[in-house]
Amino acid sequence: MDYFTLFGLPARYTVDREQLASCYQELQRQFHPDRFASQPEREKTLALQQAVTINDGYQTLKHPLKRAEYMLSLHGFDLANEQHTMNDNAFLMEQLMLREELECIADKANPEVALADFAARLNGMIKTRSQLMVQQLDEQQWEQAADTVRKLRFLDKLQQQVEQLEERLLDDF
């Protein structure tokens, strides 16, 4: 059973987060291992496995990029385990330049302002690519969506580096 079916959701990228959370809580109540403490070992094991599946499914569907990767996996694109190399040289060059720019921010006269500007530009890039990804997934353009998700992974990692630098700058302040 796929995660969308498990949570009673249509198999599409846009999910009703309230319905997801509500169903998650209900499934957690039904399959909580404590409810099976007095059951035979086999029942306990099955309940524990189901609880793990419920948690994994919830975390996957809750996180936008993981949800997109999961949808693609349902259509034969296993991005989580692939050794695919990026063929978009322009995108790769842009990533190199962005990473170099980020590395230089801490040495600037006003690094907080420079980082805020950088983060705003990065958020714009992520928003644009995310909108494209949603459209591609909705239109079942799996190959194109997979390529966009690969690019979003780069941007997501860069955003994590921005957050780390922000924390370092705050610690130094």
UniProtKB/Swiss-Prot annotation:
Superkingdom field: Bacteria
Alphabetical keyword list: Chaperone
Residue ranges of domain J in the record: 2-74
Cellular component, GO, one term: iron-sulfur cluster transfer complex
Molecular function (Gene Ontology), one example: protein-folding chaperone binding
UniProt record, GO biological process: [2Fe-2S] cluster assembly; protein complex oligomerization; protein folding
Keyword Transport: no
UniProt keyword Acetylation, yes or no: no
SUPFAM superfamilies membership: Chaperone J-domain, HSC20 (HSCB), C-terminal oligomerisation domain
Record-linked Pfam families: HSCB_C
Listed Gene3D superfamilies: DnaJ domain (1.10.287.110), HscB, C-terminal domain (1.20.1280.20)
Record note on quaternary structure: Interacts with HscA and stimulates its ATPase activity. Interacts with IscU.
Family, similarity comment: Belongs to the HscB family.
UniProt-listed HAMAP family: HscB (MF_00682)
Function according to Swiss-Prot or TrEMBL: Co-chaperone involved in the maturation of iron-sulfur cluster-containing proteins. Seems to help targeting proteins to be folded toward HscA.
Protein name: Co-chaperone protein HscB
